[in-house]
Amino acid sequence: MALNIPFRNAYYRFASSYSFLFFISWSLWWSLYAIWLKGHLGLTGTELGTLYSVNQFTSILFMMFYGIVQDKLGLKKPLIWCMSFILVLTGPFMIYVYEPLLQSNFSVGLILGALFFGLGYLAGCGLLDSFTEKMARNFHFEYGTARAWGSFGYAIGAFFAGIFFSISPHINFWLV
């Protein structure tokens, strides 16, 4: 059985490349997030657990919002572009807002981080996967082959994240 990867299909190229780049950007900081929080910022296990649970709860709310809005938008991309804008702000947010707030006012940092990560990454992953699946159905390509580029991107990003993290975690944030 031959694998059919339709590189000539512009919609496939968009979905695959966006997925690839999204997951690279996510893995550059997320793959070592807990290590950064505990080792670099000195958060306790309780603070880590609280942070993760609030992040996930907030992302569930944004997933519902994204789902309702994107269903109405169909294949229009305003939410995708909003999410892209949030991703571009990762470096400045992590270094100049999130890190100082977690160290000086944990509760405010917790809330702002949950909003940022929910909008950009945690719920954004579901938005991207749903959008890619809709594109696959409408423009005749396999969702799995397009989504595989995201997994490949995450693996590449995680590999380089470890290298850059050993130099400075801030490098990872700026590379996003």
Question: Predicted segment positions?
Answer:
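Small-residue (Gly/Pro/Ala) motifs that create kinks and tight helix-helix packing interfaces
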Residues: 34, 66, 156-165
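Residue-level signature of mid-helix packing/kink "hotspots" within the transmembrane helices
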Residues: 56-64, 154-155, 159
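C-terminal ends and interior cores of transmembrane alpha-helices
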Residues: 85-104
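Cytoplasmic helix-loop-helix junction between adjacent transmembrane helices
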Residues: 113-149
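Symmetry-related core transmembrane helices of the 12-TM Major Facilitator Superfamily/SLC fold
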Residues: 157, 172-176
